[in-house]
Structures are given as C-alpha cells and as structure tokens.
Amino acid sequence: MYQIQIKRIYTEKSDTDGFRILTDRLWPRGIAKEKAAIDFWAKELSPSTYLRKWFDHKEELFTRFRELYREELEKNPEKDSFIRLVKEELEKEAVTLLFASKEEKLNQATVLSEWLKEQLSENTKEHSA
C-alpha cells in the first residue's frame, strides 16, 4: 500500500503526488482549476465554516481545533465513502492531501491525514481478525 502525504496546493505538482485531494472548503485563491490538478475535492469533509473561522490558523488553538475537527469527521455522513475512496487509491498510488494555508504543520490536512491513517489501520485490523 502507498502512503498518505500532505502538501501545499501552491507547491508544484509532482509525479509522486499520486491521487490529489483538496482538503479546503473554499477554493484556494489564485489557483486555476487546471493548475491545481485535483482528483477529488473533499469539501464535505473539510472543517465546518464555523470551525475554520474560529481556528483562523492560530497556533494556540490548534490542539482544540484538532479535537473539534476530529469530532466533525466522526459525525460526517460522508466519512465511510471517503475512507473507501482513499483506501482504493492507496492500493494503486500515493494520496496527497492538499491545503492552501501558509501554515504547513498546523492545518486541517495534518489532522485529516492522522485521522485517515487511524481509520485505515482500524479497517485493516477488522478485516484480518
């Protein structure tokens, strides 16, 4: 199985990106759709508008943001189909979670990546039991 990686959408697309998923609710400023080369826009799995505005990429709020965003992910009706999609793509190629924020570590793609890895690990355990 391939790896999940995260990358800023403003960084040039590379051959190692594999399946590219945009994790922002809003389309990134100044990026043409062709240049973005998005395979899937996970708009419905991005943080809610309320949570995004509350967090506002403030470092001191990141721990709480992570908790609240993970709660949103767990309650999201789209989560199972998204996990399935990522799992299917990882069998063929890498999956790159894209974000627009200048903050490269404290963003929703980091949280989504952690959460996905946990979900995929649990799925693997369930199927091997």
Regions inferred by a protein language model and the residue ranges of each:
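Residues lining hydrophobic/aromatic ligand-binding pockets adjacent to catalytic sites
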Residues: 1-129
